Every structure is written in C-alpha cells, then in structure tokens.
C-alpha cells in the first residue's frame, strides 16, 4: 500500500517535497538529502505526517 508523504527540511522546517512510499517495505520514517531552496543548499529532509 503506497501512501503520500511530505518531506520537510530539518534546518528551516519548510515542507519542500511530496513523495510516496510503500509502508510495508519502509515502516520507519524516511530521511533523504535534498535541496532546500530557502537555504540554497542540500540539507537533510525528514518525512512528516
């Protein structure tokens, strides 16, 4: 079952990306290094509700 998730920047808190994930394969929260346009650099983005 795929669900929509939002990825938020850990430094500024902006929710910059929307993605989907398979909850059966990845029950934990996803953390990815993505580009934050507000800070103009790559930062860690964490899954939010």
From Swiss-Prot:
GO cellular component: cytoplasm; ribonucleoprotein complex; ribosome
Record Pfam families: Ribosomal_L33 (PF00471)
Gene3D superfamilies: Ribosomal protein L33 (2.20.28.120)
Domain of life per record: Bacteria
Molecular function as annotated in GO: structural constituent of ribosome
Keywords (A to Z) from UniProt: Ribonucleoprotein, Ribosomal protein
InterPro entries reported for this sequence: Ribosomal_bL33, Ribosomal_bL33_CS, Ribosomal_bL33_sf, Ribosomal_zn-bd
GO biological process: translation
Family: Belongs to the bacterial ribosomal protein bL33 family.
PANTHER family, sorted: 50S RIBOSOMAL PROTEIN L33, CHLOROPLASTIC, LARGE RIBOSOMAL SUBUNIT PROTEIN BL33C
Entry-linked NCBIfam families: PRK00504.1, PRK00595.1, rpmG_bact
Name of protein: Large ribosomal subunit protein bL33B
Gene: rpmG2
